Regions:
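Periplasmic OmpA-like peptidoglycan-binding domain that tethers envelope proteins to the cell wall
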Residues: 96-104, 126-211
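Periplasmic peptidoglycan-binding/tethering modules of Gram-negative envelope proteins
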Residues: 1-19, 25-120, 193-211
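A broad, low-specificity signal for short, low-complexity segments enriched in glycine/proline
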Residues: 81-84, 122, 148-153
């Protein structure tokens, strides 16, 4: 009954602990206070959830701006990968169809990639930990391959692309929360310079040599 007045709120009860997650911080805290009054012996924790739609739209806008700011005549592979990693590709559950909203980012990236020689880009797919691990690995590969195939359809040389699926391996957030699962369902890009063989894993914040 308490949750009826709190839309978009998730309650998880584990042993003597209740965890509340929702978009409205004030509403979540008010609900927590009510629960504490009813069950004083339980521990109630609150966490503000993530607005998925807003997060996705902002990430796509950031990626588009980053790609648009690159000089096509002086572009570096790391710059392209960094911009690509700004976007969130939020696949529908169980699907490997690229959302239409992300295609403009991939279009921009493809145009730039065609100007960069001697570079391979590995597209890495990840899922959350929900469901069967083997099925998740298969799905993550299909999603990564979909991204690679789309770039090829826009003129990128297939030899520049490699798709890998890791499934639920290497989580970057807590798989017990909706927000954590959302963050773990992701596509990452890794650049390999074919002249040196050096692989560089790129995120929005950093570049890391991996071998």
């Amino acid at each position: 009954r308490l949750l009826k007045g709190s839309p978009n709120t998730t309650l998880t009860w584990t042993g003597s602990e209740i965890a509340l997650q929702g978009l409205d911080a004030n509403a979540i805290q008010a609900l927590a206070d009510k629960i504490k009054a009813i069950t004083p012996n339980l521990t109630v924790k609150t966490q503000q959830g993530i607005d998925v739609s807003q997060a996705v739209n902002t990430s796509i806008s950031d990626a588009e701006k980053a790609l648009a700011s690159l000089n096509p005549d002086q572009v570096k592979p790391i710059d392209i990968a960094t911009a690509l990693n700004l976007q969130i590709i939020n696949f529908a559950t169980g699907s490997n169809d690229i959302p239409d909203a992300n295609k403009s980012v991939l279009d921009q990236a493809a145009a730039l990639m065609n100007r960069v020689p001697n570079v391979e880009l590995t597209v890495k797919g990840f899922t959350d930990a929900t469901g069967d691990a083997n099925a998740n690995k298969s799905l993550s590969l299909k999603r990564a391959q979909s991204v690679a195939d789309y770039l090829v359809s826009k003129g990128v040389d297939p030899s520049k692309l490699n798709a890998v699926g890791f499934g639920q391996e290497n989580p970057i957030a807590d798989n017990t929360t909706d927000e954590g699962k959302f963050k773990n369902r992701r596509i990452e890009f890794e650049v390999t310079n074919t002249e040196t063989g050096v692989q560089r894993e790129v995120t929005g914040e950093s570049v890391k040599q991996t071998n």
